[in-house]
Every structure is written in structure tokens, then in C-alpha cells.
């Protein structure tokens, strides 16, 4: 029996797992002991990776839709030719930007790189992905405040922090291994700020049940009180930051009296939270989608960063303003996908970076794309406006997951060509495609992923591919070959080739990985970037900003702030309730296309969409447990749910898990001004007993 160490490709923790394989079958999966991320632990999703493509497995050959709606299977060679010819015809007829793509946060670094090079540099297409839906806010905030999208922490900080503050995060459900690190810490206070009395809130020492989307007001008020009470770290502010005086003047108007009224907390609760921050010696702030997915999300993230900076809680053990990433390689997509910045970072109009990246890739600088991609929402809007004619969807299911998802259904119907590349042919998106390209799951892949704390780890094939089965990397390569892209066919033959290109592109950047050898990642503890050529690995867990130096031109972090914006979707008499969304259970993943293959997960979860409603509101509406209800959204759509009664949501709020397509039928087409990340958490709705 062989033992193969590889990386889980669900969430951004990137647990390592030992796969025990015999006769090309996975006999058991055991979490890797002493791996610095998960140290012998895993959630149910990771230890069930052997279930991928066991109940639902497509024919391994590509297929095309014929005129009568039926499908015809092709050889891979003919499939690549079909994709290349149809993309070329559309580009020639309508122009380069008539073609676009939407990808994921779950491919490898090497696949992101190859796809980004082919689609962006060679074809000049717009390519965005799931990272826009979950982490764009954090990426933009980091870049503006720190000078680069560089989360500074290591997971060890959860075990070293004496005051752990979760804001819009529910790690017990969404990141259970991260929560395990919290439990390892014997000397901590846990604070949760969340409108919902979530699983994490229930296991916290303090819960602040803030009103939905009033985070920014609360955060500015906390800053004002900290300044008034002289609780700031003046030395750190002076030596390592800029624009604090402007911030100090700005927050004066955010008084505790106003915040109490707006946020739904008592003045005493707000003042208590200030004292908890002040009394902590090592305070860490942790946020995820509850902050990232909002109409003023970037400024909310930066308000958290401001609190860490002004109290000196950054760059030290157990501290930091720490974003919790969602998908397994969202961090890799942020720096190595060629979508919002050059490979390895840097703006597309930066002449020095353009020259270095072109040299690293061995191409003429003129081949490099010269602007960022259109964001996800603009791609959908341009399809519906008739400007984008072809869309290539890779490893994602936007018919379900896109906000206000009926707009994506409309878009699919308007396309001349929809290509879907996925491990399943029966997702809501796959079923609508013109060309389907089947890919193998992660247990048959090779490459690299980067986790939420910047750790590169190896994805290594645990099972041999069967006849006609291909990795995403091989599919991209085959299409590039059919397109006649000699630069790719000659130089990007293997994932290792792509990794070495990205390594060269990273030289001199904050994410420098020139000291990482592809082969050395296998059977290792992973390596956090930066790791430059000549560096020696002294410890498995390293943090950034320990020297107080940031990646801005003057090496100082910036205090950034902006007046709290008016909510674009206020409640009204017609739509009096707020519709909040999030993960339902530990075992479910996104649109359930993968986790539906785990029997004990599916046995435990609802087969129908459900939502939580406050018991008092339910009583007033005549709604009882398991009643069927209709929820009507201001976006014009309605959906049916099963009602679950609870005291864990406020009277005027509803909560629905994202794993059912009905949920995002109701979410709004509202986006943060800077990150263009959708505001998934704050639709306004009304609710009725079915049949009323």
C-alpha cells in the first residue's frame, strides 16, 4: 500500500492529508501528522475526498451540443479543435473582448497561470472568478493599506492571542480546523461580532449582536473611543503608519450615542468592547465573508486594519488584522492568475514590472495584457447587453452561486457559445453548456496551492488517471495547442514548467518564491511566501510586518477611511426584513456539487432549501416549524423555503444557507465600489406562508 501526501482542495486552510492507495484505489485518508496547518486533524470534507466522482461521474470525453439539443461525444483532439475554432470565429467577428471566462478559487497555481497566460495575454479576453465573490474586498484593502495583497499572519497566532475577535466570521462551520487552533489556546478571550447568534458566537466569551451592515459605524466608533481614552500605541503609529491625524479628526463624529442607535448595541456594550481591546496584550482581529460581502466592504476591512495599527496589534505574535480566505487556492489566484495584476503582482501599467514579467516568461512585452480584467458583474452585464458572445466557465457553478442568479440564467441564454469545464456534467451551469470539457478531481491532479497564511503546498496525484481523463492543466494546454500558441506548446508542457515561470515572475516582489523548488514541496510542511533564493527555512510558521515595514513606497501602512455610505437597500414597508446568507453545515460546500457525494453528509442535511426565522416573527405570521414559506425579494424574484424557527436570528432578519439555488435567486445586484464584490448578506425581502 502506498502513502501519498497531498493537499485538500476545499477551503483555504489547505490541510494536508495522507492518502493510502492500493490497486489505484484510495483505501483510507488520514490527516497528516505534524503538518503545521492541521497537525493530524481534518473536517469531514477532507477525509471524504475519495468520494469525488464516485456517484456522479461523467464520460471522460468532451461533448458538443447538436442542433437538436442532443450531445455528441468527441475525441479530445477534436474537442480541442472545436473549442479553438469556435472561439476564433467569435473573436474574428466581434473582437477580442467578445470572449470572456469565469473560473474558480480551487484550481492549482499552475492552472491559473496557464489559463491566465492563454486567455489574457494571447487572446486578450476578460477573465474573472470566484475570488471576486469572496476575497476581492480583502485583496483590495490589503493593497491600498499595506501596498500589496499580503495577509501577514500565521495560523499559530490563534494559539498565541489573548484576545481573539471574529467579525462577520463563523469558523466553527466554515473553517473548523482554524477553530481547532483557537481551542488549542488555553489563555484567550473569544469575542464575536455578528448579527446572528452563530455557532461561533455561542462558543464565545462575548457576543455583540450588531445590526446587519452597520459594521463600519461600529468600527469607526471604537477607534474614536480608543483615541479619546488615550489607548493608542503612539510609538507604533509614529514610526510605522501615515495619515493617522486625518483619521483621528475624521472619527470624532462617530460617537457612542450614535453608534448605539445605529448598531443596535447598548453604549455599555460598545464601551466594554473598547476595554477588552485595550486590556489585551496580543489582540487579533479575524474577518471573512460577513465583512467582505457588503456595499462598503473595503472600507470596513480597512477600519479593522486601522484598529490593529493604532493599537500596535500587528506584526507581533498573536496579533494582526487577519482575513480568513475562502477557497483552497484563492490566494494563488490573487497573485498568479494574470487577472487583476501581473503574474507575481504589480499593476499592468507599471513599466518596470511589465519588463520583468515579460523577461521571466520569455516573451515580448507587447504580448502582455495591458489592463485588469472586467470584474465578474460587468462580464455578466456585458453578456446580457449582447457585447460578450462566448463564455468559458471553469470549475464553478455560477447559475447557482452568482448573486441575483436569474441574471446569469438570462446571460447563458444569450450567449452564442458557453463552454463549461468541470468534474461534473450535471451542475446547473453544466447542463446549459454548448461544449462540456470533463476534468479529473483533485486526487488525480498535480500542482501547487497557496493557503490563507501564504503557505505553498503540493497537490500530488493519489490516483492514476484512466483512459481519456485529463487534468484542467492538460485541457488548457490542449486548447492552446489547437489555437497554435507556440509559446505555450513549447514552454508550458507541464505544471512544473508553469510553476517555474511563476517563480521567476515573483522575483523581488512581496510574494517572492524564488527559493522554492517544485520538487521540494512534496512530502513537506509547505513553505510560506516570501521565500527568496538563498533563504533558509528556520521555522514552519512565519508572519509579515514584524519589522514594522510595509510594501508601500515609504514602507508605512496607510490609515484609510471614508464617510459611512447610505445603505443602497434599506428596508421598507413592502420589504421589511433583511435576508442574510452563509454556510449551513460543516459538511456542505458551496453549491453541493462535490459534497453531495458524501453519504453521511447528505443523510444529515435538508434536501430542500430552508431558512431560519425568528420565533416571534414566525408566530405573528402564522408560520410553524417546517412550514413552506415564500420569500419575495426587492430584486423582483421569489423563492420557496422550509421554515426553521429559532431565537438565533433577530426579529427583522432571516438567514438562509447558500447551498441551495433558491438562496441566491433573492440576493441583490449590489457591489462594493472598490472591490466589486457582491453584497450577498443584505437583500431586503418579505416573507409569507405559502398559499397566503
Language-model-derived ranges and their functions:
Residues 466, 472-527, 595-611, 616-692:
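Long, contiguous, secondary-structure-rich segments that constitute the structural scaffold
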Residues 69, 229-267, 344-359, 363-368, ...:
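N-terminal leader/propeptide and maturation segments of large enzyme subunits in energy/redox metabolism
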Residues 174-190, 305-306, 404-418, 455-458:
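A short, gly/pro- and small-residue-rich
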Residues 1-229, 247, 253, 266-267, ...:
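N-terminal export/assembly segments and adjacent metallocofactor-ligating motifs
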Residues 196-199, 423-460:
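Flexible glycine/proline-rich, aromatic-decorated loop/lid segments
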